[in-house]
Regions:
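Flexible hinge/capping segments at coil-to-helix
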Residues: 128-145
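Short, low-complexity disordered leader/linker segments with a strong preference
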Residues: 1-27, 346
Length: 346
């Protein structure tokens, strides 16, 4: 009997070890968590393509998993057993960090931050119809606000705080479901203003080659819109093309690229920006195997630098990442303090 019990115990332990060792295999794949912040179908299909590429590069089995909303993504992190990484928005990552720490007593890791248009931060843009008569942030008082969903950093959390701090009371709210859907609602006149992500206009290639780029304090639509006389500039309308073109890189870009609303710049403008928000990036749950984490990080860095990878990551209907940059979780500490999050002990 003792011999049977001993053999049974050995078998159970062996199976446990084998199960742990098989993380990253078809039987137990790593899960790449995605959030539905832009075009849900595009995010899902692009995430699948990225997961397949990372599997090919690393030899680890990786499957993309589209969560229905931010709370579901956070739950995936806090309940994971060292087998989850993801591309979470800033607010989603910070909430996942807190919940995971509460549940496990351990901290998530944040080794890569995204780069968009040369920046590792972004802003909330307050967008309005140009014919609305809304010209300043203060003019938003009493107006109907369209936002993506409550878990969105730039779409809801930051603007909600800024509107409240400024004493602005909106005349109503509409939850649209995504940044793109918010823009559609504004374009159709269903809301008076929206809050959505803003990345600065991209300078012409000849200026970029000289190191020039948009800086905070510059015209919010530099090279894109001329208010006197009112007209659009840039590649979007064909007014200026080639090496002298400026490019729209904010929430309106996707609608220009797919031709859905070719007059979106003529119809929709920006009246204000939020304070800067650190970009989203690549995060891992606690206890993710160190060697596999390093392999995945290296694979993302190499893949996004290829034409195939860059086309996937930079798609404005995905997450519009031009590149990634090494970082640590500490990059969020100033933002944590500004938004009332506790700075973790490390």
């Amino acid at each position: 009997m003792r011999r049977i019990l001993a053999l049974t115990l050995i078998a159970v332990l062996a199976l446990s070890v084998i199960g742990f060792a098989q993380a990253g295999t078809k039987a137990n794949p790593y899960r790449l968590i995605l959030v539905p912040s832009t075009d849900v179908a595009v995010v899902a299909s692009t995430g699948d393509a990225i997961a397949e590429a990372l599997t090919r590069i690393t030899g680890l089995e990786i499957q993309a998993f589209m969560t229905p909303d931010i709370p579901a993504a956070i739950s995936e992190y806090s309940s994971a057993e060292g087998d989850v990484f993801g591309f979470l928005s800033t607010a989603a990552y910070l909430d996942a960090f807190v919940e995971t720490l509460d549940v496990t007593g351990k901290q998530c890791d944040f080794p890569l931050i995204s780069v968009r248009n040369g920046y590792i931060g972004y802003w909330t843009g307050y967008y309005v119809r140009r014919d609305s008569g809304i010209e300043t942030f203060a003019d938003l008082d009493g107006k109907v606000w369209g936002y993506p969903y409550p878990g969105s950093t730039s779409g809801y959390k930051v603007p909600a705080a800024e509107l409240a701090n400024a004493g602005i009371t909106v005349g109503g709210t509409v939850e649209t479901g995504s940044h793109n859907a918010s823009l559609v609602a504004l374009y159709n006149g269903d809301v008076d203003f929206i809050s959505a992500f803003f990345s600065p206009p991209q300078a012409p290639i000849v200026l970029r080659q000289m190191g020039f780029q948009w800086e905070p304090g510059d015209d919010l639509e530099l090279g894109i819109w001329n208010s006197t006389p009112a007209e659009t500039w840039g590649e979007a309308t064909g007014r200026i093309t080639g090496d002298l073109a400026w490019y729209v890189k904010d929430v309106r870009e996707a609608f220009l690229l797919d031709g859905t609303y070719p007059d979106v710049v003529e119809k929709i403008g920006i009246v204000a920006l939020s304070s800067v928000i650190p970009n989203d990036g690549v995060s891992f749950v606690p206890d993710f195997p160190a060697a596999d984490k390093a392999a995945i990080v290296a694979a993302i860095k190499s893949f996004i630098a290829t034409p195939e990878g860059n086309a996937l990551f930079s798609n404005p209907n995905f997450y519009a990442w031009d590149n990634v940059q090494d970082t640590t979780d500490a990059i969020y500490d100033v933002y944590r303090q500004a938004k009332g999050y506790a700075v973790p002990e490390r």
